[in-house]
């Protein structure tokens, strides 16, 4: 998730091209041990890395299961710029291996950000293999994913945000002897803003322009509706 975190900054949506909870080590999950190191043992300022291990979990629904796996991320931050690369690989359970090709689930991702002078801008690209779950609970054999976000913090409290999220599924529903199909599974623009009254309280609103084609949505069983959100947050 360390690479996806750079662009998972949208007002309401975002971060869902490939990262999701309880999907191997791509988000909040269970049965993991994590080691993080800052400034590379004190030798290189801004160079950080993390190593993660996840134990086998086969006692849940097939989309929430995982075999033994490991993950690694490395990031470097200097003068407002940040760069990160992440990779993870896990065994698939016997139930999962029956859906698509391969006994392993993998993801790699690269991201970059600029966070200075009241500006936040970030981009992320990543690919998954036998890992990403479609809306109809099938695993995608491969996905190609891109996310981008830009925001500006005004001194009077307004923080407008513009984000884009895209994910293309490749070779979907392929089986031995049967070729799969390609289809977009996520494709939208989010326009939104926060307004901060003080450090404890803010209001926000966002609109999601869903660009997903109905033909692609019919293949992946994804929604095509636009969405709107408004809310208020108070932090004690």
Language model features: what each stretch is:
Residues 1-21, 55-66, 93-100, 177-180, ...:
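Surface-exposed loop and membrane-interface regions of Gram-negative outer-membrane beta-barrel proteins
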Residues 1-56, 66-68, 75-82:
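Outer membrane beta-barrel
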Residues 33, 195-197, 223-236:
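Outer-membrane beta-barrel "beta-signal"
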Residues 41-44, 140, 211:
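Short, aromatic- and cysteine-enriched interfacial helices/patches
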Residues 44-50, 80-82, 118-120, 159, ...:
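Outer-membrane beta-barrel architecture
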Residues 65, 70-191, 195:
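Detector for outer-membrane/organellar transmembrane beta-barrel domains
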Residues 142, 184-186, 208-209, 213-225:
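Mature soluble domains of exported/periplasmic/lumenal proteins and thiol-rich metal-chelating peptides
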Residues 190-208, 212:
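C-terminal closing repeat unit and adjoining cap/tail of repeat-based domains
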């Amino acid at each position: 998730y360390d690479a996806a975190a750079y662009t998972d900054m949208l007002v309401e949506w975002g971060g869902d091209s490939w990262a999701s909870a309880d999907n191997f080590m791509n988000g909040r999950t269970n049965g993991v041990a994590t080691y993080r190191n800052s400034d590379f043992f004190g030798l290189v300022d801004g160079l950080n890395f993390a190593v993660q291990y996840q134990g086998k979990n086969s006692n849940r629904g097939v989309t929430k299961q995982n075999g033994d796996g490991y993950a690694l991320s490395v990031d470097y931050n200097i003068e407002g710029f940040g760069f990160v690369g992440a990779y993870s690989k896990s065994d698939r359970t016997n139930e999962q291996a029956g859906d698509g090709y391969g006994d392993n689930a993998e993801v790699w991702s690269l991201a970059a950000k600029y966070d200075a002078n009241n500006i936040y801008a970030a981009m992320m690209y990543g690919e998954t293999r036998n890992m990403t779950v479609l809306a109809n609970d099938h695993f995608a054999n491969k996905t190609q994913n891109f996310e981008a976000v830009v925001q500006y913090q005004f001194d009077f409290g307004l923080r407008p945000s513009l984000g884009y999220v895209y994910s293309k599924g490749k070779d979907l529903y392929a089986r031995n002897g049967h070729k799969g199909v390609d289809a977009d599974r996520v494709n939208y623009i989010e326009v939104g803003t926060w307004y901060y009254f003080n450090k404890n309280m803010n209001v926000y609103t966002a609109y999601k322009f869903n660009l997903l084609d109905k033909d692609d949505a019919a293949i992946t069983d994804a929604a095509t509706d636009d969405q709107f959100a408004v809310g208020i947050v108070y932090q004690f």
